[in-house]
């Protein structure tokens, strides 16, 4: 007697179906709605900045990728399901009423179209969503060109590896996915409809199931054969020998390469075996072929290269890898822009032969020696130039140069920006935060080589005088009205900047109805209405609704402060604006303000990068650029593996209207050429750069830090010496902090050795590999006529010239420094500024370091900030002495005279006054609307009384004795004198204050 087929899965009630549909609609709105709103507001924003072509190109490319990959992958899966269903057996026996396969089969049959279409559509949608993110790969393939450089193994142009190969991999990967999904979809379908049975010892397949699965399996293995072919080219970016070098090694080129060809042939045979199963019912042939491929992959693809590496290469690594290291050296220099035509190497002895005052370049260098450290003085700028509590400066200031009265000088510069995080009390009300406090006020600059007055001679005078502060030149609304701007600025209002954008919702709403009163805070006596071209109009209700949803802020809808002419300003960080309009660029970690043609603009360096330049060293971008400054500010490049980098674009962002301009500065970058093909109107040609703007271009810090890491190894020409690491350099650790972070490079204005004129350079000291002695000095020019020219001064391998850490130790352990530091630390915090390394005296190295003091805080509202108190100088004397002389004085001139003798210091830039005066009270910036103003700092009370006088006298006497013993060379006397100093210091500290 026949058996009834089992019932299908229970169906939902009508009410449940309605609720399910509603839930799906709500979920779709929650998922898709924010994306649609974001797309619309982005479309408006790109139109505001004039880069809507970038937005539409990227959007269309993503949509096309979504459609093509989605249709191909979904279509292949749909076709597999269709063929499997149509070739199902006519009669499928049921094992019983509880047969689970029969229940699923019944369910599928009752909803055949749903399953037949929903599964391919879902797979296609998911595949399209994933694939659309690869729009960069597709566009570079379409628009990429030639590098004009052939790889040393296959003789193919580098463009094949950077533009073509990633696209071929992209296509191949999605074909793998499509065929694999189709195989499993067919397998499941045949199983449900009886084409595949698992009962019995070996199971059973219908002819149709066998043919379909064999074709799909054979196609998959055939694609694997194609992948083996492309794997050969990927060997040129092999990581087998990292971190020693990147690229094909001896094992890769002599074992793995041949293994790939062998596996390719075996894969073709294996694919043929599966295709043969179409006609042969015996599945043992494809099974044996598969086993052969798996076994070959293990033995030929893994074991054989391992044997070659262990028994042939390792015992003779230096000789075996020599040719491949040579390839790596050449490719890395090319990829990172450190080829011999860009880098000039000079031998440098490490000790001077000519007095600095007799060398014109040294006179210029000393006169422009930077004493102000932009990494320390942010709080000093804030306390002295903040004006209002809602203004602020970035934690790290910037350095730029200006030609004033025919003389080039470097300046510490910062825009006085709006700091939303500093708003207090009623200032944080939505109306005030977003419609009243909308912009900053002006640019503040200070000459980097001078202060307002020299600190006093004694420790007490140094720490308690109104000296050692920057000499400010302010270009703001007030100075504009008074007509006394040294750096003329026509529009000092800052609507776009780093500090302004340092909050989650960084938008401002400007403008209003026609004829409405100004609302934005400008000065204490005036209000302002924005007149610039920046901002997206929100006068119509649809845009207001879109932005209210974007920021989840109902006030945008209902506020009466928004009128028909209102605009919303957002994306106010200069770096973010650049990366938005040029998503194919990597922005430098630091943007800096400059005055160009009377306007404050932010200059942003931008890089083109590649991940797989054949044989070039691959490295982590964020790891290469991290130093002591970046650790404090968090100003790092993205986590990104690169093997090619160029600073091909300089971008500017107008601080008032947000206008973004991209300028081509490298006309020999094939990557930029490709992107200019993708976005023809995005980047302006190099000849359109105004001369005044070009004069403010700096060689970017992040690129320099990447290149110095490369030069630390890749200055070596001999591959065998490269393999031993003997001639490598290291970036010194920053001696002014307690951690082992790298010392940052420094911008300095130095004398050109040929002309003696000031040259704006970015510099870095380099020490020996795992050593502390100075090994090299790197500098790169930022001057327009010599921009990007590297000079590397190489010291002898047996040099005794101290490196930065040794110099710091010798300076702070000098008896004069140690004794005064003990006195100062009782009521002050000491900070050492940038330790500058300056080549002078035709072969010598001069170290200059400012020392800042900051009075210890005595209360929660006490305002303290750093001031320059002392200048330290270190210089190694020439043979036979080779001794290191240390200068320590309130001024650079005095410190230089201590080291070189009277006269050298006369060329240093003098402070504005000789002695400081006691600090004035009541100079802290006002705080608005209920915030308590900081209390003025009470000066520290100096020690007094006969006990203190006696202790100081004994301390001075012990230091004199220590100096005399040091000069005599009597180690016994030196030890006794040192013990006396320690005893005197302990006695002084024991006096109750």
Swiss-Prot record:
Location comes to:
Cell membrane
Q: Does the keyword Hydrolase apply?
A: no
Query: GO CC terms for this protein?
Result: extracellular region; plasma membrane
Residue ranges for the region (Disordered) are: 904-948
Q: Which residues cross the membrane?
A: 18-38, 63-83, 114-134, 174-194, 211-231, 260-280, 288-308
Q: Locations of Low complexity compositional bias?
A: 908-926
| Pfam families in alphabetical order | UPF0182
Q: Locate the coiled-coil region(s) and give their ranges.
A: none
Q: Topology with regard to the membrane?
A: Multi-pass membrane protein
- Pro residues composition bias: which ranges? 933-942
* Main localization category: membrane
Query: Which key words tag this protein in UniProt?
Result: Cell membrane, Membrane, Transmembrane, Transmembrane helix
Which family does the entry's similarity section mention?
Belongs to the UPF0182 family.
Name the UniProt record assigns to this protein: UPF0182 protein ROP_64500
Q: Which organism is it from?
A: Rhodococcus opacus (strain B4)
């Amino acid at each position: 007697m026949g058996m009834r087929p089992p019932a299908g899965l229970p169906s939902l009630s009508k009410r449940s179906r309605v609720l399910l549909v509603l839930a799906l609609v709500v979920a779709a709105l929650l998922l898709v709605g924010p994306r649609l709103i974001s797309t619309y507001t982005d479309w408006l924003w790109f139109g505001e900045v004039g880069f809507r072509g970038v937005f539409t190109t990227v959007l269309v490319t993503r949509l096309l990728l979504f459609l093509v990959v989605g249709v191909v992958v979904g279509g292949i899966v749909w076709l597999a399901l269709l063929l499997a269903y149509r070739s199902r057996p006519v009669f499928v026996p049921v094992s019983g009423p509880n047969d689970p396969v029969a229940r699923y089969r019944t369910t599928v049959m009752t909803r055949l179209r749903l399953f037949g279409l929903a599964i391919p559509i879902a797979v296609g949608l998911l595949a399209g969503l994933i694939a659309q993110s690869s729009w960069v790969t597709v566009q570079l393939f379409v628009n990429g060109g030639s590098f004009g450089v052939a790889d040393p193994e296959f003789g193919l142009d580098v463009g094949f590896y950077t533009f073509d190969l990633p696209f071929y991999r992209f296509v191949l990967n999605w074909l793998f996915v499509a065929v694999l999904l189709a195989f499993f979809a067919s397998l499941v379908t045949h199983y449900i409809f009886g084409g595949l049975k698992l009962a019995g010892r070996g199971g059973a397949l219908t002819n149709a199931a066998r043919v379909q699965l064999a074709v799909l399996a054979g196609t998959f293995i055939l694609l694997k054969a194609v992948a083996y072919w492309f794997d050969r080219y990927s060997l040129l970016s092999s990581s087998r020998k990292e971190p020693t070098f990147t690229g094909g090694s001896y094992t890769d080129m002599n074992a793995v390469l041949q293994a790939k060809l062998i596996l390719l042939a075996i894969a073709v045979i294996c694919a043929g075996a599966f295709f043969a199963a179409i006609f042969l019912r015996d599945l043992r042939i494809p099974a044996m072929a598969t086993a052969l491929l798996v076994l070959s992959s293990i033995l030929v693809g893994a074991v054989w290269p391992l044997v070659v590496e262990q028994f042939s290469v390792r015992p003779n690594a230096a000789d075996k890898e020599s040719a491949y290291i040579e390839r790596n050296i050449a490719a890395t220099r090319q990829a990172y822009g450190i080829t011999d035509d860009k880098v000039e190497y000079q031998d440098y002895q490490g000790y001077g032969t000519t007095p600095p005052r007799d060398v014109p370049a040294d006179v210029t260098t000393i006169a422009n020696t930077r004493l102000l450290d932009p990494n320390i003085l942010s709080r000093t700028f804030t306390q002295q130039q903040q004006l209002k509590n809602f203004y602020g400066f970035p934690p790290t200031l910037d350095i730029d140069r200006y030609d004033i009265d025919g003389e080039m000088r470097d300046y510490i510069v910062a825009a006085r920006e709006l700091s939303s995080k500093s708003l207090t009390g009623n200032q944080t009300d939505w109306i005030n935060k977003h419609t009243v406090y909308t912009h900053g006020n002006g640019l503040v600059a200070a000459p980097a080589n001078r202060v307002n007055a020299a600190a006093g001679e004694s420790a007490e005078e140094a720490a308690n005088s109104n000296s050692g502060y920057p000499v400010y030149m302010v270009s703001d609304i007030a100075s504009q009205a008074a007509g006394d701007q040294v750096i003329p600025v026509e529009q000092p209002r800052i609507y776009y900047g780093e500090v302004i954008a340092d909050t989650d919702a960084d938008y401002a709403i400007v403008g209003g109805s026609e004829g409405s009163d100004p609302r934005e805070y400008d000065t204490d006596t005036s209000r302002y209405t924005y007149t610039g071209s920046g901002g997206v109009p929100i006068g119509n209700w649809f845009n207001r609704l879109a932005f209210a949803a974007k920021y989840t802020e109902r006030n945008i809808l209902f506020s009466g402060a928004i009128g028909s002419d209102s605009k919303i300003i957002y994306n106010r960080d200069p770096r973010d604006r650049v990366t938005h309009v040029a998503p194919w660029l990597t922005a430098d970690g630091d943007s800096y303000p400059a005055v160009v043609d009377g306007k404050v603009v932010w200059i942003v360096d931008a890089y083109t990068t590649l991940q797989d330049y054949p044989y070039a060293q691959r490295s982590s971008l964020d790891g290469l650029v991290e130093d002591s400054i970046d650790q404090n500010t968090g100003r790092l490049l993205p986590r990104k593996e690169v093997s090619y980098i160029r600073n091909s674009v300089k971008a500017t962002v107008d601080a008032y209207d947000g206008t973004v301009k991209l300028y081509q500065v490298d006309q020999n970058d094939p990557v930029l050429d490709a992107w200019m093909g993708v976005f023809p109107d995005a980047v302006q040609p190099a000849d359109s750069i105004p001369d005044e703007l070009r004069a403010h271009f700096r060689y970017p810090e992040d690129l320099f830090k990447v290149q110095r890491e490369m030069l630390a190894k890749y200055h070596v020409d001999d591959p065998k010496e490269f393999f031993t690491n003997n001639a490598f350099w290291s970036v010194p650790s920053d001696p002014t902090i307690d951690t082992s972070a790298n010392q940052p490079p420094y911008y300095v204005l130095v004398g050109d050795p040929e002309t003696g004129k000031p040259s704006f350079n970015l510099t870095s000291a380099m020490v020996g590999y795992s050593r502390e002695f100075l090994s090299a000095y790197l500098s790169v020019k930022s001057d327009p006529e010599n921009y990007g020219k590297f000079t590397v001064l190489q010291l002898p391998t047996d040099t005794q010239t101290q490196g930065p850490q040794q110099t710091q130790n010798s300076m702070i352990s000098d008896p004069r420094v140690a004794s005064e530091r003990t006195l100062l630390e009782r009521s002050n915090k000491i900070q050492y500024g940038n330790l500058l390394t300056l080549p002078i005296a035709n072969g010598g190295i001069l170290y200059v370091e400012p020392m800042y003091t900051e009075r210890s805080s005595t209360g929660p509202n006490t305002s303290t900030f750093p001031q320059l108190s002392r200048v330290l100088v270190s210089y190694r004397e020439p043979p036979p002495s080779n001794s290191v002389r240390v200068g320590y004085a309130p001024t650079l001139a005095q410190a230089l005279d201590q080291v070189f003798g009277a006269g050298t210091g006369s060329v240093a830039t003098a402070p504005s006054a000789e002695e400081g005066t006691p600090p004035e009270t009541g100079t802290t910036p006002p705080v608005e609307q209920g915030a308590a103003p900081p209390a003025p700092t009470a000066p520290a009370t100096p020690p007094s009384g006969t006990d203190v006088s006696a202790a100081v006298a004994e301390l001075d006497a012990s230091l004199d004795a220590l100096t005399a013993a040091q000069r005599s060379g009597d180690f016994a006397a030196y030890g006794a004198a040192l013990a006396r100093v320690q005893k005197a210091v302990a006695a002084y500290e024991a006096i109750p204050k």
